[in-house]
């Protein structure tokens, strides 16, 4: 199934809310929000061959931000890029094959690739080899330390640690998977996959640990330079690989729907997640539990304030 065959009607471009499609877009200036296109919303295990056989099949998880920046990319997701779109930058969460594919990175035409500094050498070698094989220009591959920020295409990216593992070791250094805080003006979006919950250090790096308040921030800042002052998130995209199971053996490296729901509620109740009225948190990286399920059926079983992403969905996230 190609992007041209992928029809979503009026819901294809909606506000990131649980209201009627397009309502928030009409009431807000889209230039102030972060536009997200889900190129893929599935976990590992979905067979690309299924794309031609039936609907509701998910490509490996990947997003396109503001039509210019990618987070993760694999060959099946290339077909979901809008017609004529040539992304400029690619941020990688980790090196698992359902997220990182050097051939896809080179074919996409991006000029820069960011990875965590722990595996930058391996990433450079892989991307360079793919470019040579394809006889195409090789993107520049840059290592990014946790809590350090870079600005690309009008968006600010901060890498923070994910609770995940690849077991990749390069020159004695263990790879550290990443999540990303994406900021545009006052809008703050957390893209969290793959991860089992939000690690404490990540929460402190993006200012959402409720232990830290305006009153005691100075004390925490002295103990660790990576600690950010308290600041609420505007939007959340988080993985729910384990579906509605809280006993899945992957619980140590992946999240469930309940994990995401608890995360959203705790952040909301502590003032660390303040979306606009009607704006939902989205789950992605869905496992085979949801094979053959349309997103509407998944949404019907999700807690209030949450929705399931699907391939080709476009939403615009705003600050509250």
Where are these regions (language model features)?
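Core dinuclear metal-dependent hydrolase active-site scaffold
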Residues: 25-85, 143-229, 312-320
């Amino acid at each position: 199934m190609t992007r041209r065959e992928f029809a979503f009607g009026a819901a294809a471009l909606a506000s990131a809310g649980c209201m009627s499609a397009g309502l928030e877009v009409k009431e807000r200036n889209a230039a102030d929000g972060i536009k997200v296109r889900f190129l893929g919303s599935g976990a590992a295990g979905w067979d690309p061959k299924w794309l031609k056989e039936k609907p509701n099949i998910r490509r490996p998880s990947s997003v396109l931000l503001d039509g210019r920046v990618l987070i993760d990319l694999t060959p099946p997701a290339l077909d979901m890029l809008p017609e004529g779109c040539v992304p400029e930058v690619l941020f990688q969460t980790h090196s698992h094959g359902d997220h990182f594919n050097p051939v896809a990175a080179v074919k996409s035409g991006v000029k820069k690739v960011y990875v965590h500094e722990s595996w930058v050498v391996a990433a450079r070698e892989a991307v360079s080899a793919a470019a040579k094989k394809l006889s195409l220009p090789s993107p520049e591959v840059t290592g990014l330390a946790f809590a350090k920020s870079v600005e690309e295409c009008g968006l600010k990216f901060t890498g923070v640690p994910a609770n995940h593992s690849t077991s990749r070791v390069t020159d004695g250094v263990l790879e550290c998977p990443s999540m990303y805080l994406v900021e545009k003006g006052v809008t703050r979006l957390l893209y969290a996959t793959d991860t089992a919950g939000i690690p404490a250090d990540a929460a402190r790096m993006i200012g959402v640990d409720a232990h830290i308040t305006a009153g005691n921030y100075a004390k925490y800042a002295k103990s660790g330079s990576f600690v950010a002052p308290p600041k609420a998130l505007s939007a959340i995209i988080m993985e729910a690989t384990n579906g509605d199971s809280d006993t899945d053996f992957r619980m140590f490296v992946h999240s469930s729907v309940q994990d995401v729901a608890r995360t959203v509620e705790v952040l909301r109740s502590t003032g660390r997640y303040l979306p606009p009225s009607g704006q939902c948190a989205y789950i992605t990286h869905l496992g085979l539990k949801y094979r053959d399920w349309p997103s509407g059926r998944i949404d019907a079983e999700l807690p209030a304030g949450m929705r399931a992403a699907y391939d080709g969905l476009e939403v615009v996230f705003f600050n509250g």
